[in-house]
Amino acid sequence: VLREDAAVRDAAYSIVEHCDWMPALLIGAKHINEVPRSRCAAGHKAMWHAKWGGLPSEEFVCSLDPVLAGFRDRLYSETTTAEKPVGKLCPEWAERLGLSTDVVVAGSEFDCHMGAIGAGAKNNTFVRVIGTSTCDIMTVSPEELGDKLVRGICGQVDGSVMPGMIGLEAGQSAFGDI
C-alpha cells in the first residue's frame, strides 16, 4: 500500500499489527503510543530485539525500502509477552460484551504461537501447527541456545511463544484455502 498509494502513505502515521490492535481496542487505547506491542509480532515480523534497543535503526529500515522513511520513530521500543496483563476491559467493551471492567486483558501473540502452547509446547518440543498457514514452532532455553543464530528459519525471538524461552519459528507454508 505504501508503494502504490501516495495519499495513504502521506496520511499514514504508524503501523499496527492486528494482534496488537485487539488488546488495544479492548482496553480503550486512544493513541498509538498507548497500544501494547506484542513481543511475538515485533520480534518475528519487525526484527525487534532487546540487544539493539528494540527495532532496527532508521538507516537500516530505509536501506530496505526508502518508502519506510519516518516510520521508525513513530513505532515503539518496548514490547510485552503474552502472559502479562496489558490493562483491563474498558467501559465501552465491558458494556458491549456484558462483562465487568475488572476483566484483565492479556498481551498477545500470533495464532501459530498460541497454537503451539495449546498443543503442549515446552522446552525442546517441536510443534507443527496446521491451519490456513502451517508453522513449525520450537522453544529452547536461552542458556541452551546461547548466542547461536539458527539458519534457515524465519524467526528466533525471546518470549515469543513462552516467557523465558526462545521461540523458533519456521514454515509459513501456504495451506488451507489456496
Language-model features: locations:
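Gly/Ser/Thr-rich active-site cleft segment
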Residues: 1-109
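Catalytic phosphate/nucleotide-handling subdomain of diverse soluble enzymes
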Residues: 95, 103, 108-178
